[in-house]
């Protein structure tokens, strides 16, 4: 089996990199396990395709999400910054099927008025979503990264998602959604501020 790619730094705390050959071999074994022939027409290239897809789906494992927030601007802005309805796709770590939906991210800059680019917030969501996840942890990781890098007065993150592990198997309830929130700083202490930003998030 070929050796995996190597990198001086890839941002993942275990130092792992994606092993294409090993992933392909695993998909072949899975096809055998479910009673398929991975060498038949239509499946011959599937292990390579699936491995490449997983490399993209789990790209967040190989980049340090905090680096996305390295570029900040001292704008002396001390009011709410809110980015709503950021589309996101993640993978349930229990069944390795998708959960997808939207993230709403709001923060109040700290005493220096430090802000980051709006696209950086969307990128942060992507990098934490693109790994085996549970929705509760995903929501908290986004909030905690903003606290670490921006030192804001308050952060609130709300994620709304449909889980295919609940829609296509088990209880089979397509259309059911799960909402999680992570609240930090001023939004945690001040119920009025929290209610105001939640109202803004939920408006269409």
Curated annotation (Swiss-Prot):
Pathway where it operates: Cofactor biosynthesis; 7,8-dihydroneopterin triphosphate biosynthesis; 7,8-dihydroneopterin triphosphate from GTP: step 1/1
Family membership noted in the UniProt record: Belongs to the GTP cyclohydrolase I family.
Gene Ontology process terms (BP): one-carbon metabolic process; tetrahydrobiopterin biosynthetic process; tetrahydrofolate biosynthetic process
Record carries keyword GTP-binding: yes
InterPro entries referenced in this protein's UniProt entry, alphabetically: GTP-CH-I_C/QueF (IPR043133), GTP-CH-I_N (IPR043134), GTP_CycHdrlase_I (IPR001474), GTP_CycHdrlase_I_CS (IPR018234), GTP_CycHdrlase_I_dom (IPR020602)
One Gene Ontology term, aspect cellular component: cytoplasm
Record GO terms (molecular function): GTP binding; GTP cyclohydrolase I activity; zinc ion binding
SUPFAM superfamilies with a match to the protein in the record: Tetrahydrobiopterin biosynthesis enzymes-like
Enzyme class, first EC level, given as a word: hydrolase
Name of the protein this chain belongs to: GTP cyclohydrolase 1
Positions of disulphide bridges: none
Residues that coordinate or bind Zn(2+): 92, 95, 165
Signal peptide range: none
Self-association and partners: Homomer.
Keyword line: GTP-binding, Hydrolase, Metal-binding, Nucleotide-binding, One-carbon metabolism, Zinc
Gene, per the UniProt record: folE
The protein's Enzyme Commission number: 3.5.4.16
A Pfam family the protein falls into: GTP_cyclohydroI
Highest taxon of the lineage: Bacteria
Catalytic activity as recorded in UniProt: GTP + H2O = 7,8-dihydroneopterin 3'-triphosphate + formate + H(+)
């Amino acid at each position: 089996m070929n050796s995996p790619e190597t990198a001086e730094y890839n941002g993942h705390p275990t130092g792992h990199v994606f092993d294409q050959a090993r992933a392909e071999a695993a998909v072949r074994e899975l096809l055998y396990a479910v009673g398929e022939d991975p060498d038949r027409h239509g499946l011959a290239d599937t292990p390579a395709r699936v491995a490449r897809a997983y490399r993209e789906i789990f790209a967040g494992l190989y980049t340090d999400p905090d680096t996305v927030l390295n570029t900040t601007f001292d704008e002396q802005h001390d009011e709410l910054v809110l980015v709503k309805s950021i589309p996101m796709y993640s993978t349930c770590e229990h069944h390795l099927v998708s959960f997808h939906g939207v993230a709403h991210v709001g923060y109040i800059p700290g005493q220096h008025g430090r802000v980051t680019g709006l696209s950086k917030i969307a990128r942060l969501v992507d990098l934490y979503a693109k790994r085996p996840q549970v929705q509760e942890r995903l929501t908290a990781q986004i909030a905690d990264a903003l606290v670490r890098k921006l030192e804001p007065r308050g952060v609130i993150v709300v994620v709304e998602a449909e889980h295919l592990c609940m829609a296509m198997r088990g209880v089979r309830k397509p259309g059911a959604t799960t909402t999680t929130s992570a609240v930090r700083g001023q939004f945690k202490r001040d119920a009025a501020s929290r209610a105001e930003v939640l109202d803004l998030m939920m408006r269409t």
